[in-house]
Amino acid sequence: DKLFHYYGSDKADIFRSTKEKGHGFSKFYSNKLNHLRDKYINILEIGSYSGASAAAFKKYFKNSKIYCFDINISNFKYSSKDLNVFGLDISDKKKLNKTLKEIGVKQEYFDLVIDDGSHNLSDMIFSLKYLFKYLTKKGIYIIEDFKHPNYYQYNRNIDHILIDELIGNLKDKKFFESNILDKNDQDYFFDNITKIETFKGNLKDSDILFIEKN
C-alpha cells in the first residue's frame, strides 16, 4: 500500500492528495500477484491517467515492462524506459489493432492486463473480449470498479447483462445473450478461464475482479 500511497494512486487505502479513503485494492494486488514480483513480466494498464499506478507497479515489479493506454495522455507525469505510454480510445478497434501491431505485441504476450479505464459497460466487455487473448498462460486479467454500471446509470451505456452476471455465467459455463461476446467468444472463455475471484475494497464502488487464464 505504501507504493500506491507514495505515488498518489487511488488504489491505496488513503488517497494521498485528498487524505480521503481510497479504494483499498493494495492487499488484493499483493495477495494475488506477489508471486510475480521478481519475474520478467509484461503489464498492460488501461486507464493510466497521471501514471501513479503504473509508477507503483514498476517499483513493485522491478523486472516489468509496462504499457499504458489512456484516451488522454497529457496528464501522464512519470517516465522510464520500461513505461510505454499510448494515447488511444480502447473502444477504437482499428487504432487498438494498429497500436498493438506497432509495438510488436502478439497474442499471449501480457502477464497482467489491468482495466481501470472508463468503467463503461461496453468498454469493459469489449476489452475483455479483445485483450484476454493477449494474456500469457497463467496470466491474470483484472477489472477495477467493475460494478460501476450497477451503481451509476451513466456507466450502463448499453443494453447488456452486467459484469457480475456475466462472470457468473462464465463460472457456470452457461451461454448468455450478448451483442459483444458471441458463442465463439464465450466458448473461448469457458475453455481458457481457470479461476474468477471478486473482492470488495473500502468504498461502495470499490469492486475488483481477477480472472486467471489456464
Enumerate the language-model features and the residues they cover.
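A short alpha-helical cap/connector motif
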Residues: 1-114, 118-143, 147-214
